[in-house]
Regions:
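Short, small/polar-rich loop/turn modules that mediate ligand/substrate recognition or access, typified
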Residues: 156, 161, 230-232
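Short C-terminal tail/terminal secondary-structure segment
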Residues: 1, 128, 208, 219-220, ...
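Residue(s) in the substrate-gating loop at a strand-loop-helix junction
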Residues: 123
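Conserved mid-core segment of classical short-chain dehydrogenase/reductases
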Residues: 75-89, 112, 132-136, 176
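Active-site helix of classical SDR
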Residues: 103, 140, 148
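Alpha-helical segment proximal to the catalytic Tyr-Lys
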Residues: 108, 153-154, 228
Length: 246
C-alpha cells in the first residue's frame, strides 16, 4: 500500500525512544522527511513545556510540514494522595499545553499549504482511567482526546485532519527501563518487575502488551494520504483493554 508520504515533512515529538522512535523510523521508511523533537538525542532538542517551543519547532521545518505527531509524554505509578500540585502541573503542561501550542502553530501553516495531518498520542487511560498510573496522567490524557476533537472540528474543512491514537500498555522503555513503571508498580505491590509485567500482559484480551511498532503503524496510517476521510477519530490500539462501547 502506498501511503503518499514520500518527501513530506513530518514532525514527531518524543521521538528519541519508544513509540516516537518507532514512528520516526516507520515514517522514514515510507520516504518522509522526519524531524524528531525531544529533550535529548533528537533533531530538535528542547523542552516542549517552554511556551516558545512550538514556534522553534515550526521554524526548524525545512518547508511547510505535512504531519505533526504529538507523542511526547511521561507517567509515574503514584497514588493519588502522593501527587502534589507541581506533579499535576507538570502533566498538564506536557500533555495538554505543549500539544495545544504545537497544533495552534502548525495547523495554520498546514492549511496554507493545502492540508496536513495531526496525530495526538493519548492513552487508553484517557478513555478509562487506570489505578495503576497516576491520576494526573489519566486526566490529562483525557483532556488531550478532547483537544484533538476540538481542533479536528475547526480545521477539517481546510484539509488539516486531526486524530488521536490511544495505546494500551506498551512494552517499551517507559515500562521496562530500571526505575520504570514495572519497577514502580512492583515496589507499590511488594512484588517484582517480572510479576508485574506478566500480570499486565495476562489482563489484556490479546494476552500481551503492544510493541512500539504496533502503535506506530496506526499513527503512520493516520499521517498518510490514505487517511483522507478520517477526522476527529480516537483509535484504540490497546489489545482490547477498553470496551468498544465505552
Amino acid at each position: 500500500m502506498q501511503l503518499g508520504l514520500e518527501g513530506k515533512v513530518c514532525v514527531v515529538t518524543g521521538g528519541s525512544r519508544g513509540i516516537g522512535a518507532a514512528t520516526a523510523r516507520m515514517l522514514s521508511q515510507e520516504g518522509a522527511r522526519v524531524l524528531t523533537v525531544a529533550r535529548r538525542r533528537a533533531d530538535v532538542e528542547l523542552d516542549l513545556t517552554d511556551p516558545d517551543a512550538a514556534a522553534r519547532v515550526l521554524d526548524a521545518c525545512p518547508e511547510a510540514p505535512w504531519a505533526l505527531v504529538n507523542n511526547a509524554g511521561t507517567s509515574q505509578a503514584r497514588a493519588l494522595e502522593e501527587l502534589t500540585d507541581a506533579d499535576w502541573q507538570e502533566q498538564w503542561d506536557l500533555h495538554v499545553m505543549a500539544s495545544m501550542r504545537l497544533m495552534r502553530a502548525f495547523a495554520p501553516r498546514m492549511g496554507e499549504a493545502g492540508g496536513g495531518r495531526i496525530v495526538n498520542v493519548s492513552s487508553s487511560s484517557g478513555k478509562r482511567p487506570s489505578s495503576n498510573l497516576d491520576a494526573s496522567y489519566s486526566v490529562t490524557k483525557a483532556a488531550q482526546l478532547s483537544l484533538s476533537r476540538v481542533f479536528a472540528d475547526l480545521w477539517a474543512a481546510r484539509g488539516v485532519l486531526v486524530n488521536a491514537v490511544a495505546p494500551g500498555p506498551v512494552e517499551d522503555e517507559l515500562w521496562t527501563d530500571p526505575g520504570g513503571l514495572a519497577d514502580q508498580l512492583a515496589a507499590r505491590r511488594g512484588s517484582d518487575r517480572e510479576e508485574v509485567l506478566e500480570s499486565s500482559r495476562s489482563r489484556l484480551p490479546v494476552g500481551r502488551m503492544a510493541t512500539p511498532e504496533e502503535i506506530a503503524a496506526a499513527i503512520v496510517f493516520l499521517c498518510s494520504e490514505r487517511a483522507s476521510n478520517v477526522s476527529g477519530a480516537s483509535w484504540s490500539v490497546d489489545g482490547g483493554s477498553v470496551p468498544v462501547n465505552f
